[in-house]
């Protein structure tokens, strides 16, 4: 079964893969990293003017990393906005995904957190650096193959 977003992308010959619907009926699409930025721009023009959330996760030990975007069409007088979930998978060795900061400013800290925790590099992000961990931290704590250090240095909050 194909949703509205998938049908629209097919109509305009944009490469994607439908992953079905979640329990709320929101369609999930898979987009290749090299196609993501152009599809993000097109989605914004199509009316997805709000990035509700962006997160990332490690699919499997030694496997792919995923960056997930929840987009919403906010329109005056519409009480049930149209939503879509987009997943972009990247290889673990060199996870690079185009940043959507220049389309949705709310992606700023969310992409930085995904970088900090999983090491996904968001290309053309204006200030991609750690946001939760110290700059000197080694590794990506939310990766399934991450080995936690035996000790932590206690630091002042000042």
Curated annotation (Swiss-Prot):
Keywords: Chloroplast, Membrane, NAD, NADP, Plastid, Plastoquinone, Quinone, Thylakoid, Translocase, Transport. GO terms for biological process: photosynthesis, light reaction. It is found in: Plastid, Chloroplast thylakoid membrane. It is an enzyme of class 7 (translocase). One of its GO terms (cellular component) is chloroplast thylakoid membrane. It holds the Pfam family Complex1_30kDa. This is NAD(P)H-quinone oxidoreductase subunit J, chloroplastic. It comes from Liriodendron tulipifera (Tuliptree). The lineage of its organism: Eukaryota, Viridiplantae, Streptophyta, Embryophyta, Tracheophyta.
